[in-house]
């Protein structure tokens, strides 16, 4: 098992970024230390403006502040890019879907949101990943509750940031972020014991949530196959998180931002199914919010071979790709289509939709791949 406290790993990640960014980072490679990243938040970019002989100093400070912000955003996108790379390398279906969509719509492809799963215990829950996004200017928005699945989630709105010219995916408009957590204290004592066994054995792992996702490694040791099966019997979400950790659970294509005829989710669903892509059928392929403004669908998750600590190798669920169309709000229906902005469309998430999309990694849906 690779340790995220390894100085070699930190050095490798640090060296993977452009030299223009490395100078902005304060990095310590001693065991157990954190990589300190430049912040986008206003609190770390404030400049004191003075007059007279200090004017040149103020000008230099402004220049440095602007440069730091650009470097920070570039670094942030690079980390998202590493998360995306791990995700696409492990999951052939999302990679195929992106290629299929681009074969028809080769212009800018935007992500609506990125999603992650966590264990809500001992600091390993939503906050462990949220801190990475909050440091870069994201804003916490609404809480969603899923009592039947014993889950809760928070979504985060992105800061205003300039997309890379012509950039797609993580280099396009910054996506929303959706982070969920298992309410561990509501699970059976047996399930709680398994989860605590791994999270408590790695008490500092929660500090490296973003790094774990970017490197594609767990922050705890590989579990026993019997423990995975035990969790799966009570919560398939719990079992998924035990073996996938902070891996990107899914990315979501912003359907209405596509430029071709695929910019309507029903047409996109039909196109993908005709190409042999299996879509999550739980609650119907198309999930629609009560107000009709948020329409979503998703593929069935891919499976990968996983070798457990006891030497047993099994197929486990991995990740999937989602699609979201956000309709124009009623009060903006009279605005010309060419003038419609994202702020004119339905924002946020819907519990009923998300509840069914969670099941993209569940066995009932996975079995449809071979059905």
UniProtKB/Swiss-Prot annotation:
Pathway: Amino-acid degradation. Fe(2+) binds at residues 113, 250, 322. It catalyses: 2-oxoadipate + O2 = (R)-2-hydroxyglutarate + CO2. Disulfide bonds: none annotated. Keywords: Chloroplast, Dioxygenase, Iron, Metal-binding, Oxidoreductase, Plastid, Transit peptide. One of its GO terms (molecular function) is metal ion binding. 2-oxoadipate binds at residues 113, 117, 296, 320. Disruption phenotype: Delayed germination, compromised development, cholortic phenotype with impaired growth, due to lysine accumulation. Signal peptide: none annotated. Its cofactor is Fe(2+). GO terms for cellular component: chloroplast. Residues 1-50 form a transit peptide. It is found in: Plastid, Chloroplast. Its EC number is 1.13.11.93. Catalyzes the decarboxylation and hydroxylation of 2-oxoadipate (2OA) to form D-2-hydroxyglutarate (D-2-HGA). Is involved in a D-lysine catabolic pathway. Belongs to the 2-oxoadipate dioxygenase/decarboxylase family. This is 2-oxoadipate dioxygenase/decarboxylase, chloroplastic.
């Amino acid at each position: 098992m690779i340790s995220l406290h390894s100085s070699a790993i930190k050095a490798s990640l640090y060296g993977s970024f452009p030299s223009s960014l490395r100078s902005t980072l304060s990095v310590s490679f001693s065991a157990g230390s954190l990589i300190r990243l430049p912040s986008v938040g206003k609190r770390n970019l404030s400049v004191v403006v003075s007059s007279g002989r200090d004017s040149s100093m103020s000008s230099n400070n402004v220049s440095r502040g602007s440069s730091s912000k650009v470097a920070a955003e570039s670094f942030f996108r690079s980390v998202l890019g590493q998360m995306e790379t791990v995700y696409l390398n492990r999951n052939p279906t999302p990679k195929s879907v992106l290629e299929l969509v681009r074969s028809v719509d080769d212009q800018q492809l935007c992500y609506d949101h990125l999603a992650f799963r966590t264990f809500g215990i001992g600091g390993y829950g939503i906050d462990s990943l949220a801190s990475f996004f909050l440091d870069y200017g994201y804003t916490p928005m609404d809480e969603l509750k899923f009592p039947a699945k014993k889950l809760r989630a928070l979504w985060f709105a992105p800061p205003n940031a300039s997309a890379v010219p012509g950039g797609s995916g993580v280099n396009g408009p910054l996506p929303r972020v959706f982070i969920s957590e298992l309410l561990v204290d509501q699970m059976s004592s047996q399930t709680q014991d398994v989860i605590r066994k791994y999270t408590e054995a790695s008490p500092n792992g929660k500090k490296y949530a973003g790094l774990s996702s970017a490197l594609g490694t767990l922050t705890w040791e590989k579990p026993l196959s019997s423990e995975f099966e035990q969790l799966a019997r009570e919560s398939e979400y719990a079992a998924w998180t035990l073996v996938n950790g902070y891996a990107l659970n899914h990315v979501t294509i912003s359907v209405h931002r596509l430029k071709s005829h695929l910019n309507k989710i029903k047409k996109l669903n039909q196109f993908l199914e005709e190409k042999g892509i299996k879509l999550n059928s739980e609650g119907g392929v198309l999930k629609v919010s009560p107000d009709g403004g948020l329409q979503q669908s998703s593929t069935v998750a891919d499976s990968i071979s996983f070798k457990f600590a006891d030497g047993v190798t099994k197929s486990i669920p991995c990740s999937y790709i989602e699609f979201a169309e956000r309709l124009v709000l009623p009060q903006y229906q009279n605005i010309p289509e060419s003038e419609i902005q994202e702020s004119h469309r339905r924002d946020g998430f819907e519990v009923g939709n998300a509840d069914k999309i969670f099941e993209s990694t569940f066995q009932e849906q996975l079995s449809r791949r071979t059905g």
